[in-house]
Regions:
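Residue-level signature of catalytic and energy-coupling elements of molecular machines
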Residues: 4, 90, 145
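A generic structural signal for alpha->beta connector loops
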Residues: 23-25, 42-43, 86, 111, ...
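A general structural signal for well-ordered alpha-helical segments in protein cores
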Residues: 36, 56, 66-70, 76, ...
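C-terminal substrate-binding/catalytic lobe of Rossmann-fold NAD(P)-dependent dehydrogenases
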Residues: 184-185, 189-196
Length: 196
């Protein structure tokens, strides 16, 4: 499958590497050009998201926040400039569900499908799948996504319609951060009363 991948940070770079190693034809792009250097041997380095998306069947987005996702997908040099009807966009970033709906409206008018596919780290090596991926979208689109997402996922689940994957990820984050805060408060309480 022809795949574009935008965003080669600490999560995106290993995801992209595993996509290429699983036999997909990969084009990559990052706002920091040096981030692409490690993938030059296995991927085409693109000058923009639009360049990366030329001929792509699936485009993956793994950038920092809602604003960056919108720019990568819908901006002047965004994915929509090159993706053809029938293509699929996967959002791996953790963003607001309202932002997903905004993207869906813009992409649907162009015949491009959208699946939210946020990831949660499980384990990490350079050669093995290392994340749990939560998918939200229509069943046919999710089935298409599995062919790519399976390259880097230890587990992947279809959580429901568009937004359900993101809701599951945000809920997971809430539980994780709540446990961290409770743990810190419990430690302070114990220390205050002299518990070693």
């Amino acid at each position: 499958m022809r795949v574009a991948f935008v965003g080669l940070g600490s999560m995106g770079a290993p995801q992209a590497r595993l996509i290429a190693r699983n036999g997909h034809e990969l084009a990559v792009c990052d706002a920091v050009p040096a981030a692409c250097d490690a993938l030059r041997a296995i991927a085409r380095v693109a000058s923009s998201p639009a360049d990366a998306a030329k001929g792509a069947e699936v485009a993956c987005v793994c950038v920092r926040d809602d604003e960056q996702v919108i720019e990568v997908v819908l901006g002047g040099a965004g994915l929509v400039e090159s993706l053809a009807p029938g293509a699929l966009v996967l959002i791996h970033s953790t963003i607001g569900i309202d932002t997903l709906y905004r993207l869906q409206a813009a992409l649907k008018s162009r015949g491009i499908a959208l699946v939210d596919a946020p990831v949660s780290r499980t384990r990490r090596t350079d050669d093995e799948a290392f994340v749990f991926t939560m998918l939200g979208g229509e069943s046919g689109d999710v089935d298409q996504a599995r062919a790519v997402v399976g390259a880097f996922s230890t587990d992947l689940d279809h959580m429901g319609p568009l937004g359900a994957g993101m809701a599951a990820k945000i809920a997971n984050n809430l539980v994780t951060w709540t446990h961290l805060v409770i743990g810190a408060q419990a430690t302070l309480l114990a220390a205050h009363y002299g518990v070693p």
